[in-house]
C-alpha cells in the first residue's frame, strides 16, 4: 500500500497503527463467555465434545457424545465461536480453534476454555489476533494460581485492546495469513517427517550394533 498515514495507538507496546484503523476491546467486538441456546436438542442428540487435548493450533477433533451425558460443568460453545485455553501450559501451547462444523451445531469442552463469539469483527481476523506473541506474553503475566493450574485473567482478555481495519482489509489480511501459514505448516510437516526418519535410523543403528547384526570395523 506504500506509505500510509499512521497514528499513535496510545499503547506503548503497539506503537503506531494505520490512521483509519479503529480502537476497540475484545468485550466490545465479541461476546465473551456467550450463552448457548440448547432448546432444540433432545437428550439423545449427538453433540461435539472436545476435551482440551482435542484442540490445538487452530484445529480440533470432532468427538461426539450424547447431550444427556454432558453436565453443565463443561464449557458450552456453538458454531462460529472461538475457544482457547485459559490454563497453563495449554494457553502457551496454542490450544485455540474456531469451532465450525459442530455436531448439531453445538458443543461442550473443558471448563478451562475461554469462549468468544465475534460480533463486529471478522472471525478469522480476531482468531489470528489472539495468536500474536504480545497478547500471549501479557496474558501470561496476568496468570494466577499455583503450579500447573495457573490461569489467564478473564478481565485481561475482556479488556484487551484490538485495533480493527475495515472489513475489506480484514479479509485481505486473513487471506494473506492463510496462504503464508499454510505454506509454513507444509514446511513444518516435511521437517517433522525428516526428523522422524532420522530418529528411526538412530534406533535401527543402535539395535543392529548392540545385537551383533553389525560389527565395528
Predicted regions: what they are:
Residues 1-4, 161-217:
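Amphipathic alpha-helical coiled-coil/heptad-repeat segments
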Residues 5-39, 159, 171, 194:
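Non-catalytic DNA-recognition/assembly elements of restriction-modification systems
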Residues 6-8, 39-47, 141-143:
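Short coil/turn segments at secondary-structure boundaries
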Residues 15-23, 113-124, 155-178:
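Proline-centric
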Residues 27-39, 45-82, 98:
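Sequence-specific dsDNA recognition surfaces
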Residues 73-133, 145-147, 153-154:
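A short beta-sheet element
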Residues 135-138:
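Periplasmic-binding protein-like
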Amino acid at each position: 500500500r506504500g506509505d500510509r498515514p499512521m497514528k499513535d495507538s496510545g499503547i506503548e507496546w503497539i506503537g503506531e497503527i494505520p490512521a483509519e484503523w479503529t480502537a476497540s476491546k475484545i468485550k466490545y467486538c465479541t461476546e465473551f463467555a456467550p450463552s448457548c441456546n440448547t432448546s432444540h436438542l433432545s437428550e439423545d442428540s449427538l453433540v461435539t465434545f472436545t476435551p482440551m487435548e482435542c484442540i490445538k493450533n487452530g484445529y480440533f477433533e470432532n468427538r461426539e457424545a450424547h447431550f444427556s451425558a454432558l453436565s453443565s460443568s463443561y464449557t458450552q460453545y456453538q458454531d462460529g465461536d472461538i475457544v482457547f485455553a485459559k490454563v497453563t501450559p495449554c494457553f502457551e501451547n496454542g490450544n485455540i480453534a474456531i469451532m465450525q462444523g459442530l455436531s448439531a451445531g453445538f458443543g461442550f469442552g473443558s471448563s478451562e476454555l475461554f469462549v468468544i463469539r465475534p460480533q463486529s469483527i471478522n472471525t478469522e481476523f480476531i482468531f489470528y489476533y489472539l495468536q500474536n506473541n504480545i497478547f500471549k506474553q501479557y496474558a501470561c503475566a496476568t496468570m494466577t494460581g499455583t503450579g500447573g493450574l495457573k490461569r489467564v485473567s478473564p478481565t485481561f482478555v475482556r479488556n484487551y485492546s484490538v485495533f480493527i481495519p475495515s472489513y475489506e482489509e480484514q479479509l485481505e489480511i486473513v487471506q494473506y495469513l492463510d496462504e503464508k501459514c499454510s505454506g509454513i505448516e507444509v514446511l513444518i510437516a516435511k521437517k517433522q517427517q525428516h526428523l522422524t526418519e532420522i530418529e528411526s535410523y538412530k534406533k535401527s543403528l543402535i539395535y543392529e550394533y548392540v545385537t551383533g547384526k553389525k560389527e565395528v570395523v
